[in-house]
Amino acid sequence: LVAQFFLKKAMMNQTNPPQRPKRAQRSDGRSTRAVVLEAAGKVFAERGFAEATSKEICERAGTNGAAVNYYFGGKEGLYEEVLIEAHRQMLSLEDLNRIITSEATPEEKLRVFLKHIIRTAMNASELWGIRIFLRELASPSPFVPKFITTAVFPKSQKLRELIRDITGLPPDSPAMQRATALVALPCMGLILFPEKLRTLMLPATAGDAEGLLEDMLAYMLGGLRALGETAR
């Protein structure tokens, strides 16, 4: 009888296993993962990957010291996510896709795209992602190739759709690659070029957003159309 009692109790435990307590939510409504990612971006921007520590990141985030390993698998995995978020701060894939798939003309889509880029450039000093990329330009990390595949290529493909509609260039042609570079690189340069230096050297690029937009639009449309004519 005693054996039957313990056997029955064991079977009940198997069919009704104890429930894990639910993880408490943060009072501010933000997920712990997002808070750690934000704190990490700021720490990496200040110190670089080599000097940053998981301990400091967790302290900044106000989380358990094991949060980096729990959510990202370690500092390396966290930095990979930080690079993706840094690129998203400049232009998210969702925003770009919304522009490309709109009912607007290709010329108007390019205008909206450039307006977004200029707005980002005007607020670049507030974005830790910009400092991350300045560090990467000075000393590229081994995480860049994966970041390019994960974050840059999907946006590049979307941008090519817009360029194709303006130029008529084949999507995989060398001319399309060059055209994409001639659109993307000036945008990146505008965002990454420190605002204080732009104000000193080229003040018209720092204060007159509307004038800059019209000039960039005319410059890029003229160039892209010329490339399309040359390829025909």
What are the residue ranges of the model-derived segments?
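Hydrophobic alpha-helical connector segments
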Residues: 95-127, 173-183
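Short alpha-helical scaffolding segments that buttress acidic/His motifs in well-ordered protein cores
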Residues: 117, 130-137, 180-187, 216, ...
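Helix-turn-helix
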Residues: 35, 43-77, 81
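Hydrophobic/aromatic-rich alpha-helical bundle segments in the mid-to-C-terminal region
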Residues: 145-153, 162-217, 227-232
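Short secondary-structure transition hinges
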Residues: 90-97, 101, 118-157, 204-210
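N-terminal intrinsically disordered/low-complexity leader segments
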Residues: 1-31, 42, 230-232
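Generic hydrophobic, amphipathic alpha-helix propensity
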Residues: 32-41, 57, 82-90, 159
